[in-house]
């Protein structure tokens, strides 16, 4: 019988990743023995792997995060190639966030939401409360000035939030989480990018079959042809993968 409260780690190009077998493993690991873990969750995909290589500050930020997990299918395939016995699966950040929110609602875990447009954030709060009875103890949209950051950190700390989710895009959200933890360290932080937009229906996600086949990237490209430059950039990652430079 597998022990879901622990997880192996795997290294790709110097980055240590948690190897979750599936979503249930991820949830049981984060809520091991009824105690929510504290630290920072960062989703890792091929694009982020490239950014880490190119930007020393981002690499330092992400290396410092306790819980780095495979969000992209390319990363999962690379782990399996380097470690043939690895039982690791993709855990999509958007799905993990929803499951965390559902679990938080069930267990009364307090949540603070940061980021997104004001109207999207308001809709996210309403849906979380209606759908899972999530105890949201505070929120702040993404439109705040740099000089307001410290006051926001103090608000988060005063709220006593056990989970803080930040939708600001990378690396802004990683910088925010790092700095906020100096004021409010006793929480689980999660960078969620555009998840609020998807959750509220403002952005359409790839159909399940595309996700299952590992083709969510292609769906996004077909939906947004302007992403072609970003996708071509990923050829470098494919070279790492197929030459075994992992």
Curated annotation (Swiss-Prot):
GO molecular-function terms, A-Z: lipopolysaccharide N-acetylmannosaminouronosyltransferase activity
Pfam family, one: Glyco_tran_WecG
Catalytic activity: UDP-N-acetyl-alpha-D-mannosaminouronate + N-acetyl-alpha-D-glucosaminyl-di-trans,octa-cis-undecaprenyl diphosphate = beta-D-ManNAcA-(1->4)-alpha-D-GlcNAc-di-trans,octa-cis-undecaprenyl diphosphate + UDP + H(+)
Transmembrane segments: none
UniProt pathway: Bacterial outer membrane biogenesis; enterobacterial common antigen biosynthesis
Gene Ontology terms describing biological process: enterobacterial common antigen biosynthetic process
EC identifiers of the protein: 2.4.1.180
Swiss-Prot/TrEMBL keywords: Glycosyltransferase, Transferase
Top-level lineage group: Bacteria
Family of the protein in this entry: Belongs to the glycosyltransferase 26 family.
Job of this protein: Catalyzes the synthesis of Und-PP-GlcNAc-ManNAcA (Lipid II), the second lipid-linked intermediate involved in enterobacterial common antigen (ECA) synthesis.
Name this protein carries in UniProt: UDP-N-acetyl-D-mannosaminuronic acid transferase
Source species of the chain: Escherichia coli O157:H7
Organism lineage string: Bacteria, Pseudomonadati, Pseudomonadota, Gammaproteobacteria, Enterobacterales
Gene: wecG
């Amino acid at each position: 019988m597998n022990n879901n409260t622990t997880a192996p780690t795997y290294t790709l190009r110097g980055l240590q990743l948690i190897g979750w077998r599936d979503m249930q493993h991820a949830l049981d690991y984060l809520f091991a023995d009824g105690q929510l873990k504290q630290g920072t969750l960062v989703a890792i995909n091929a694009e982020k792997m490239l950014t880490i290589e190119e930007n020393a500050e981002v690499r330092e930020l992400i290396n410092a995060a306790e819980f780095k997990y495979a969000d992209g299918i390319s990363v999962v395939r690379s782990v399996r190639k380097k470690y043939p016995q690895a039982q690791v699966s993709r855990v999509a950040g958007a799905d993990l966030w929803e499951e965390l929110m559902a679990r938080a609602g069930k267990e009364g875990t307090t949540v603070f939401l940061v980021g997104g447009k004001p109207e999207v954030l308001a809709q996210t709060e309403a849906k979380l409360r209606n759908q899972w009875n999530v105890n949201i103890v505070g929120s702040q949209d993404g439109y705040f000035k740099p000089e307001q950051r410290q006051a926001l950190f103090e608000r988060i700390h005063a709220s006593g939030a056990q989970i803080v989710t930040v939708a600001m895009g990378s690396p802004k959200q990683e910088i925010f989480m790092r700095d906020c933890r100096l004021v409010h360290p006793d929480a689980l932080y999660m960078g969620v990018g555009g998840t609020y937009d998807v959750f509220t229906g403002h952005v359409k996600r790839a159909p399940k079959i595309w996700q299952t086949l590992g083709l969510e990237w292609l769906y996004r490209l077909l939906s947004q042809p302007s992403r072609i430059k970003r996708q071509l950039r990923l050829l470098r990652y494919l070279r790492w993968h197929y030459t075994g430079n992992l």
